């Protein structure tokens, strides 16, 4: 069997990259390990175009946001599923945070994403009335789990997915192609998320994965339409249910949920609202993150038949569609963007093994 690409992994990165190849009429086979720990399985799908800690735009947001909206609307049409829900996010401000908010909106040119004036009119009887809020107009949510499940169904219909663990030792490299089992392709692209830390082809990459836990609560009296962001986010997902998250830890990177995370999330939620609730679910996942929190994309210089698309991290829902389109375009020779940073050999001691895409057009 001959295809253009082999894709390893069908989390968010693998799904978005496969969709771009599909859109560009390229053939591929996806190998997906159903037992792998994936952040996509528990991701809230929160879309946030700013970095609240510094009150700056998220990396590449001016290019990434319109591409994100286009891609998810296209996927909704292709899969016949509602996936993307744009909306507002209300950021809880500190007592003197209103002036800082207003100052940074102007200083960092955030008017396209945020309301300039702190919002003093947002009220919900179940949210503490001691808060003032900053309003993020361009926020929302992607149903990541529904997207991955529906796209997997499409791949199954097209006989383009194999739900099995990829064995690195069985990959055979030729000068201009790769072969795995009975599949030959021009390139193999690894979209493995946190599992990439065990990939022998990328052993010099500096991963810094983190574990995140989130809760699903049933809160009949809350009646909240907006996402609220404070010490935790509270995101409506329908039928009086809300996602509340998320924790960050850098040890015990597994799928086990913990009592400590549950307590942390509930304590922080109760700082926002005293409304009675019922815990419906608790999940844990591993965020695929690089040491510098930047997405890593590129081809091995010594073996350009091997590539990687990884490290989307907490901004993956926003940045993923943009990077997937640029990477697929680059591989297929029709990208209008250059990769600017130097590529280092897999055998070098360089901290950076691969390139990052730049937002500068050629």
How would you describe each model-predicted region?
Residues 22-41:
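Glycine-rich FAD pyrophosphate-binding loop
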Residues 281-362:
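C-terminal catalytic lobe of FAD-dependent flavoproteins
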